[in-house]
Amino acid sequence: NFWIVQGCYRSIGGYNGGTYVSNYFDTNIYMLDGDSIQTFATFDFGSMNLPKDFFEGETKELVPKFNDFRENNKAVLNIDNTTITDDWIVFCPPLFEPKEVIYCNRKNGKYLINNDFSGFYAKVLGKYDAPDGYDSRSGEFYRLVNAALLKEAIEELQQSDEHYLEKYPFLKGTDPEKMDEESNDWVIFFKT
């Protein structure tokens, strides 16, 4: 009868005709396909795994233990912001400070931790934010970016680097003076 407010730390999305889901207190990704459910991927974080006996005991013992694990980053309690592609599984373990985005290469099983964005990319894509999705036709991840934030970031680039378009050619034709700060979010596409 253990009860903890779990918040919204879970993911749901589509991949290859199925629907994937993740849930709190679980580092598996499940694939729903019709009437069946399969474990699609299991992540092992070694010493950062939630102990197998974590849920043994009464609520009055478990709540302080849970708070200790959560507040002191002692375990990966779940995965969130999940995006699945043919080559990658991308997710973010929530509640970690600093946040980290983990890119798991499905072909070789290696992990990349993308916590070193800097400058323009950090401001626009978020230094520790997972992508919002993936376009399988172009092979690009995408992220929704606030128009006012994008305008400000481009203006800063213009002032600090007169050759910024050589470094960021995808900004050609984007004039911050013509951008409406009140417009809908922009979609930025990028590859890993």
Positions of PLM-derived features:
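Structural signature of eukaryotic scaffold interfaces centered on beta-propeller domains
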Residues: 1-23, 64-86, 129-138
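Internal helical hairpin/lid segments
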Residues: 72-122
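Conserved blade-ending motifs and adjacent loop-strand segments that build the rim/top face
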Residues: 40-74, 107-138, 145, 150-154, ...
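Sequence/structural signature of beta-propeller modules
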Residues: 49, 161-192
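Structural motif
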Residues: 25-32, 95-104, 149-162, 183-188
